[in-house]
Structure formats: structure tokens, C-alpha cells
């Protein structure tokens, strides 16, 4: 790598599971995979070369208040990952930086769009 931050492809997934039946506690896991690519030399037609792949899983525990069951899916798959994303992003960028690669800024994820995309595929 010539010191220029690689182009980063970020793949994000979210999952949620109830910790115990009939309990209001849930574990929400945010999985992030960053793949850094550079174009070798000055040839814009050259195929990008992968220089790193970093994967993390970051989870949070959430208790859903009584009366919020009708919003359960959006609470767990939109609001909860939105809350834990900044810390997960920080850890991912630290991992890449400590591996010796220049870091590129990772923009916030649109968890509403991700949720709609997952629902459309289901």
C-alpha cells in the first residue's frame, strides 16, 4: 500500500435473539466485514487488489420494556444496532490501523434501509 487509504467495501449484518423464553432480554449482534482494495500502479484499468479483510462481531444486550412488543422488530434490528454501531466502527478501524493499513472513514449505516432490504428478500 502506498500510503493512500484503500477503497473499503463494508458488508453489514444484524441478528437478534431472545436470551430466554418469556423474558424481555435480547442479544443484538452487529457483524461488520471490511475489505480494503487498491488499484496497483497508475493503471486505472487494472483490477483492484485486496489488501486486507477484517471481520468483527459486536453485540449488545437489550431489555425491551413491556408494551413495546409491537415495535420489537424495529427496536432490535434498527434502533439497537444504531446504538452499538459507533463502538463497533471504532473497533474495526482500530483493528485495520493496528494491522498497519491506512484507515478510511466508514460512514454510518442506514439500518432502516438494511431492514427494508432484508424484509424484501424474506
Write out the residue ranges for each language-model feature:
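N-terminal intrinsically disordered, cationic/polar leader segments
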Residues: 1-83, 89-122
Amino acid at each position: 500500500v502506498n500510503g493512500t487509504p484503500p477503497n473499503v467495501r463494508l458488508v453489514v449484518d444484524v441478528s437478534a435473539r431472545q436470551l430466554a423464553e418469556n423474558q424481555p432480554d435480547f442479544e443484538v449482534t452487529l457483524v461488520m466485514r471490511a475489505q480494503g482494495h487498491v488499484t496497483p500502479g497508475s493503471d486505472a484499468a487494472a483490477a483492484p487488489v485486496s489488501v486486507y479483510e477484517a471481520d468483527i462481531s459486536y453485540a449488545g444486550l437489550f431489555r425491551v420494556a413491556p408494551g413495546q412488543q409491537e415495535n420489537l422488530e424495529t427496536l432490535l434490528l434498527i434502533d439497537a444496532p444504531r446504538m452499538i454501531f459507533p463502538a463497533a466502527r471504532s473497533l474495526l478501524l482500530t483493528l485495520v490501523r493496528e494491522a498497519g493499513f491506512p484507515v478510511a472513514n466508514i460512514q454510518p449505516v442506514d439500518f432502516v434501509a438494511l431492514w427494508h432490504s432484508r424484509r424484501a428478500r424474506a
